[in-house]
């Protein structure tokens, strides 16, 4: 053994060939600060071996290196800029020394090689991969950019266009694509990986492969003519501006850095990467996006822990076909859980099956599946007008009309047709689960399972625990949701549960703004362009459906009359009475026409102005700051109340539900992350300016206490140790 660290070791293989093996104590390898330091020590040992002829890098895990240790990021991002820059210089010196070894090097890459893992293998001369490879640089999705030389080496290896596509979008690619663009040199079966890598090394050692020529371009300026450079970088900047926008500075910074570094060799190019990385790491956007990643890991870990003792349902059923039922059936079947889909109407069944088939055909068109796979999946969805097969299902989700009487009748009837241990769930969006449970003989086997539309795209499923829902029931439904590829978050029961309960105060803020003379077009523009929502409130209401919102608004008002009961006729009422139901009938706040792809495209419709004038004061202008404050305060206050009342368990789960269920702007990180960034005292000052608008603007006492003591909702993070300590971590 030449070297043994906590996460890697170095040993001789044969005849002057050494192997450096990543083998962390956990289930995966991460390139954390300790591993970077250990890698530097191992390379120091290699530099002393006069008989070294070649080096093989490999992993003892199912994945090579999944990336940097993101749990370290928030503390690293608090380190002063100069210290962070010094540590990056140290880390890059490690990879430079790996790249500069006077012998050929190869990485045998299996599974994931992401972020720092990808940057590590870019420093070797050759890369041999297995078919399960996923390799790339996802840093821009975390609000930063590659910091271990990825933005320098990848463009010089692949060319500017391919590298920009991966780096700016934070993409990873599979084995075939990686081979095609030159990111790896070959793909072999897993059992042949080490053998194949040694064979390539031998060819390089023997002079059959010119490893020095392979290495040289990574040390030099990017080979690109002025015209080629102008085209590549102009197109890339245009694409990034269009897709990322101003709220996500990392992608455009990465592109500009690669452009600026193109005319320099490795050392100066790495200095430019360093100078760009450090300011990005200190942005609120980076902290928020890293926070989302960590919250996602927390939520998924909680679901995994909750379901460790239950069996995932093997057969499911959906009550109520149509678009929603068909979407749920598709998602379950697509992920391997067969479904019985029942409806009382043949047309609805046809609609549900058509929806499932349409979604499968999209997969076929994209080349994700072949005709055989399509036929296989669709054959596991069984449409029926009766209860045939319900005696074999493990879980049933009801997705009929949003009417408590209808839902109770359907659920009570279904309970008599299934096994005593079968779990029933309702896809209601607003009706309290405990109320629906009153119709059942076995309420302990019942809970809520709130999907979001469109089911195949929206990652969140709210799992609602009723007063009598058993732990086993919740666990089984969480297991099914996880199997479907969704992110389940368990909430306690109340009208609207969590997501809709906090959404409707936001809509109420919108209605009050309109009533006071604000224009919905400006509100939409401000909330989209300035705050960063994917849709403004008017557009979102049109997508949800004005009729759906009108009904849900009444349910929420009955559930929370003190805050959500209104004593005036609002814009939603006016549009509902005029039969303007939104996208579903082409008329809402906006008018909708289908584009060439059959998708609804919004257009101006001056008719709506006359309707709104009847429920609004004369038009007046509102500042962007006032619009954002009046829209967000009711939502944030309600989010805080839900935490204080135990409807949602943690700030992390609340923020993920908002991001995954409503599209809360990820660069803000969710309501609690936004609050912490703004500061609770500053938020309180802002909210008090609008408390005259009514109870929705009254800040909950718990938040007032936070403001008094200057306490955040997320645990405070301590800065990482000084750079000198980090080197020897």
From Swiss-Prot:
Entry-linked SUPFAM superfamilies: 6-phosphogluconate dehydrogenase C-terminal domain-like, ClpP/crotonase, NAD(P)-binding Rossmann-fold domains
Catalyzed reactions: a (3S)-3-hydroxyacyl-CoA + NAD(+) = a 3-oxoacyl-CoA + NADH + H(+); a (3S)-3-hydroxyacyl-CoA = a (2E)-enoyl-CoA + H2O; a 4-saturated-(3S)-3-hydroxyacyl-CoA = a (3E)-enoyl-CoA + H2O; (3S)-3-hydroxybutanoyl-CoA = (3R)-3-hydroxybutanoyl-CoA
Subunit text: Heterotetramer of two alpha chains (FadB) and two beta chains (FadA).
Site residues by UniProt (Important for catalytic activity): 119, 139
3-hydroxyacyl-CoA dehydrogenase: annotated segments: 311-729
HAMAP family: FadB (MF_01621)
Family in the record: In the N-terminal section; belongs to the enoyl-CoA hydratase/isomerase family. In the C-terminal section; belongs to the 3-hydroxyacyl-CoA dehydrogenase family.
EC number: 4.2.1.17, 5.1.2.3, 5.3.3.8, 1.1.1.35
Region (Disordered): 708-729
InterPro entries named among the record's database cross-references: 3-OHacyl-CoA_DH_CS (IPR006180), 3-OHacyl-CoA_DH_NAD-bd (IPR006176), 3HC_DH_C (IPR006108), 6-PGluconate_DH-like_C_sf (IPR008927), ClpP/crotonase-like_dom_sf (IPR029045), Enoyl-CoA_hyd/isom_CS (IPR018376), Enoyl-CoA_hydra/iso (IPR001753), FA_oxidation_alpha_subunit (IPR050136)
GO molecular function terms noted in the UniProt entry: 3-hydroxybutyryl-CoA epimerase activity; delta(3)-delta(2)-enoyl-CoA isomerase activity; enoyl-CoA hydratase activity; long-chain-3-hydroxyacyl-CoA dehydrogenase activity; NAD+ binding
Species for this entry: Escherichia coli O81 (strain ED1a)
Pathway where this protein functions: Lipid metabolism; fatty acid beta-oxidation
Full protein name: Fatty acid oxidation complex subunit alpha
Function: Involved in the aerobic and anaerobic degradation of long-chain fatty acids via beta-oxidation cycle. Catalyzes the formation of 3-oxoacyl-CoA from enoyl-CoA via L-3-hydroxyacyl-CoA. It can also use D-3-hydroxyacyl-CoA and cis-3-enoyl-CoA as substrate.
Stored Gene3D superfamilies: 1.10.1040.50, 2-enoyl-CoA Hydratase, Chain A, domain 1 (3.90.226.10), NAD(P)-binding Rossmann-like Domain (3.40.50.720)
